[in-house]
Amino acid sequence: MIQQESRLKVADNTGAKELLTIRVLGGSGRRYAGLGDVIVATVKDAIPGGNVKKGDVVKAVIVRTRKNTRRTDGSYIKFDENAAVILKNDGDPRGTRIFGPVGRELRDKKFMKIISLAPEVL
């Protein structure tokens, strides 16, 4: 469950290390974001020489959450951290590598490029 002001780890090689959520996209009064949801965030921490700088406003998709996510078969999945992947305007990832596992829910939300780059899909 990601909401406004939530801090997330960045799971790609764009140069950003931490994001702060500004807004959850997908409805005027939407409060929470889960796996596969898109957010608007700002970069709070970045490495020098990266593609994104501290203070940049970016769109990102949630790939891991600490909160349990219920699946259609009745099972639940949760991760050890909250993480996101930074997106371009067309919905493709801005980085060329994804670090760590991602949820299968991204396949249902049509983020196939992230699924193909991820080392593990749970």
From Swiss-Prot:
A single MF term (Gene Ontology): structural constituent of ribosome
Q: Which NCBIfam families match?
A: rplN_bact (TIGR01067)
The family database entries (InterPro entries) matched by this protein are listed as:
Ribosomal_uL14 (IPR000218), Ribosomal_uL14_bac-type (IPR005745), Ribosomal_uL14_CS (IPR019972), Ribosomal_uL14_sf (IPR036853)
PROSITE patterns with a match to the protein in the record: RIBOSOMAL_L14
Check the record and name the SMART domains matching this protein: Ribosomal_L14 (SM01374)
Tell me what organism the protein belongs to: Leifsonia xyli subsp. xyli (strain CTCB07)
Q: Which family does it belong to?
A: Belongs to the universal ribosomal protein uL14 family.
State its role. Answer: Binds to 23S rRNA. Forms part of two intersubunit bridges in the 70S ribosome.
* Protein name per Swiss-Prot or TrEMBL: Large ribosomal subunit protein uL14
Q: Subunit info?
A: Part of the 50S ribosomal subunit. Forms a cluster with proteins L3 and L19. In the 70S ribosome, L14 and L19 interact and together make contacts with the 16S rRNA in bridges B5 and B8.
Output the Gene Ontology cellular-component terms.
Answer: cytosolic large ribosomal subunit
The UniProt entry, under Pfam families, shows: Ribosomal_L14
Q: Name one GO biological process term.
A: translation
**Keyword annotations of the record:** Ribonucleoprotein, Ribosomal protein, RNA-binding, rRNA-binding
Q: Which gene encodes it?
A: rplN
